[in-house]
Amino acid sequence: MKTDIEIAQAADIQPITKIAEKIGLSFDDIELYGKYKAKIPLEVLDKFDQQSEGKLVLVTSINPTPAGEGKSTVTVGLADAFARQGKNVMVALREPSLGPVMGIKGGAAGGGFAQVLPMEDINLHFTGDIHAITTANNAISAFLDNSLHQGNPLNIDPRRIIWKRVVDLNDRALRHVTVGLGGPLNGVPREDGFDITVVSEIMAVLCLATSISDLKERLGKIVLAQSYDRKPVTLGDLGVQGAIAMLLKDALKPNLVQTIEGTPALIHGGPFANIAHGCNSVLATKTALKLSDIVITEAGFGADLGGEKFLDIKTRQLGKQPDAVVIVATLRALKMHGGLDKKELTKENVEAVKKGFANLERHIKNMQSYGLPVIVAINEFASDTKSEISALKDLTEALGVPVSLTQVFAKGGEGGLDLAEKLSGMLQEKSDFSYLYDLKEPLSAKIDKVVTEIYGGSKVNYSPKAKRQMREIEENGWNDLPVCMAKTQYSFSDQPNLLAAPEGFEVTVRELLPKIGAGFIVALLGDVMTMPGLPKNPASLKMDVTDDGKISGLF
């Protein structure tokens, strides 16, 4: 079979104006970024404000292997399957971060015959949104350091600055740096550090904002540091939220592209799900809901991370809950949860599938606990055997949950027709949605509920630093915000090697970070890194460009 990039380059890509026409947008309604990409201006969205919203399908997954389980692939393939059935459908995805693309993933725009196009552009610089976020974030750092240099009128304590610089790369050498060296003319020396751009609160703000005015209001609330008298210092105190919003003006507009089969796709925003909230922008999802009858969207990593945050954070801003949830499962991941070594995952082992099923079962029950209908999509790999597939189907159906074998990687939309057919019936059902926690509950109670009811843990411990931060959050009146858990994606716990469905474990909250602009509190569990490093053999070693500009090696 051809590689992803070979399939993408051979695809018959349509002018983006043709794709826009499918969803009722004229040439004047879009801003072209070349022939195959466009942005949708916010004023165009206002035209559809009174239009009824379509059905919303959330695609999530079990706890993944390092290679991922194909959520984006299934999301794209499912949308194409609905389109083949004559449905008015759109897909809404996150934009890939360049760091993981160059590092381990080698591309994140779907796979096989279920991809979004133009694949190379989407995986690289796309329409420049992430670069705009990088610039906005680092402009804040520049204004902050300038305030220190110019007499420190805000009385900022340089030892208590929590705002970091960012770059959209995996670069471990930048995790801890010192700035302001070289004498009085070069600023105030202090410790600093870099995060990867998609971890920036600016990314979360962009993804949760609903208008330019909302964007400015959220930016003004971002907490940058503490003063010497331990009061929060915000971007609003610096007085540059208007300038930062100006830098993000175009990045706020959703990006329109297409799938291999010509289904309209909105790709906008890309926060990580193990650190941030892991969902594409509210504006893109709202736009898709107004312009189509069915919207397929995904949330990063497993249902314990992106799935939980989609339901407890994003839906509160979106004003709509999913009408159904698809949980993507792979036999290789289930065998990993069943105790097999990574080298053994391509070999048949039905017993390991049965043992690892505990992971999928917990994710199913978690999503059902929100009152949502659930279907399992088995994302087929070439190494899967009939016996393993049969065992997984039997186990899933024994729970009373529908299941579908999807072959969208190899067959595109055709390989998702069964999933689309089963979902069509489910979308007619009424869900009885309820949130995991009430926003008025204490922050500690919200964290307890996520850990005990979603993860299966027994106790939450807090570091001395986290206890102090909890008191500060209460004193500042931030207690009624949702919690955004930051932990490993590989396990329900905060320990990446504790696989399947562990119970009775304890987790430790080491830090609580106020993301007031985004509108949530981040609870850092375990050893989550906000700036990834590159592997020994990064995916970029296989990437190249020919003399005539043709790219290779983006998986």
UniProtKB/Swiss-Prot annotation:
Domain of life (superkingdom): Bacteria
MF annotations from Gene Ontology: ATP binding; formate-tetrahydrofolate ligase activity
Lineage of the species this protein comes from: Bacteria, Bacillati, Bacillota, Bacilli, Lactobacillales
Catalytic activity of the protein: (6S)-5,6,7,8-tetrahydrofolate + formate + ATP = (6R)-10-formyltetrahydrofolate + ADP + phosphate
Gene Ontology biological process terms from the UniProt entry: tetrahydrofolate interconversion
Protein name (record): Formate--tetrahydrofolate ligase
Pfam family, one: FTHFS
Binding site for ATP: T65, P66, A67, G68, E69, G70, K71, S72
E.C. number: 6.3.4.3
Keywords from the UniProt entry: ATP-binding, Ligase, Nucleotide-binding, One-carbon metabolism
The protein's annotated pathway: One-carbon metabolism; tetrahydrofolate interconversion
Gene behind the chain: fhs
Family in the record: Belongs to the formate--tetrahydrofolate ligase family.
Family matches, as NCBIfam families: PRK13505.1 (NF010030)
